[in-house]
Curated annotation (Swiss-Prot):
GO MF annotation list: nucleic acid binding
InterPro entries xrefs: Restrct_endonuc-II-like, tRNA_endonuc-like_dom_sf, UPF0102_YraN-like
Similarity-based family: Belongs to the UPF0102 family.
Xref: Gene3D superfamilies: 3.40.1350.10
HAMAP family: UPF0102
The protein's name in its UniProt record: UPF0102 protein Rsph17029_0461
Amino acid sequence: MSGEVSYYAGQTAEEAVARIYDRSGRPVAARRWRGVSGEIDLIAREGAEVIFIEVKKSKSHAAAAARLSRRQMDRIYGAASEFLAGEPRGQLTASRFDVALVDALGRVEIIENAFAA
């Protein structure tokens, strides 16, 4: 897939995931939020909790999941920490990290709290 095609495929996947969160009462507050440490695809809210969402698209859900590396997770953690610094409760703000996997047919699988050990 060319760079431009990949970019638009990623945007389409993010839009599909954002609609799922919005429709389930967890409004998306930011898209492609960028901090010094990295970028977070989507940031949603569920009550007082902040949800950081990484969207991965590939031919299958398994292939999409395999594209998430430890290094990338570390960058997402860093960016999330920067985002939380701007929240009223700072680092004490309730938060979680979801991963949304999108396959070639546009089917979405959301893994809530995916970064939990």
